[in-house]
Design a protein with these regions (language model features):
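Short, well-ordered alpha-helices that flank and scaffold nucleotide-derived cofactor binding pockets
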Residues: 2-3, 78
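Conserved structural-core and active-site-/substrate-pathway-adjacent residues in large, well-folded domains
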Residues: 1, 46, 123-126
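Post-Walker A helix-loop "phosphate-sensing" segment adjacent to the P-loop in P-loop NTPases
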Residues: 3-12
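Core active-site phosphate/anionic-ligand binding loop and the adjoining beta-turn-alpha structural block
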Residues: 42
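PAPS-dependent sulfotransferase catalytic domain
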Residues: 15, 19-35, 55-168
Length: 168
């Protein structure tokens, strides 16, 4: 996707976490009650954070690739209510084993991958959060199965671009 002229990808930077911290609103009830002005301020804060990493124009489509953003879907939806979500998934066994075997720098999120049982629990909770948010917010989601991408890269990429309203 990053090779598309209209797409800018953000490679696993804690942008959303920084925005959430700056907004100082960490309950779903607070963010769901945002006024138009508060939402606009949150969007401006997000764009300001992005500009620390990449140059963007008004026509840029931004894809934030941090996998753990799945845990912040309520914030994402309330900051960008018409935003599109691409959920890239692998077979659960592959995703869990791969995460557990990674040598991540230890922080509060990565601590979930230090034990296999904890990694399984974290994966399950993440998927439950996604399912709940998809139903609660009627999210506009495209699910990309990693195995399908490997089998037919061009077809799966065209599907994603179509979902985003972009040409191949």
């Amino acid at each position: 996707l990053s090779s598309h002229s209209k797409i800018i990808t953000i490679e696993e930077k804690p942008i959303l976490q920084s925005v959430i911290k700056q907004l100082d609103q960490d309950s779903i009830e607070e963010i769901e009650g945002w006024s138009t002005l508060e939402r606009s301020q949150a969007q401006s804060c997000y764009l300001k954070e992005i500009k620390k990493y990449v140059e963007i124009s008004s026509s840029s489509m931004i894809i934030d690739k941090l996998p753990l953003n799945i845990l912040n879907l309520p914030f994402i939806h309330n900051i960008f209510p018409s935003g599109k979500i691409i959920l890239a998934i692998r077979h659960p066994f592959d995703a869990i084993l791969s995460s557990w075997m990674q040598n991540f720098s230890l922080n509060s999120a990565m601590a979930n991958f230090t034990e296999l049982k904890r990694t399984v629990q974290f994966y399950c909770i993440s998927m439950e959060i996604f399912d709940h948010c998809e139903k609660r917010y009627d999210l506009d989601v495209h699910i990309l199965k990693y195995e399908n991408l490997l089998d037919n890269f061009e077809l799966e990429t065209k599907k994603m671009l179509s979902f985003l309203g972009l040409d191949w």
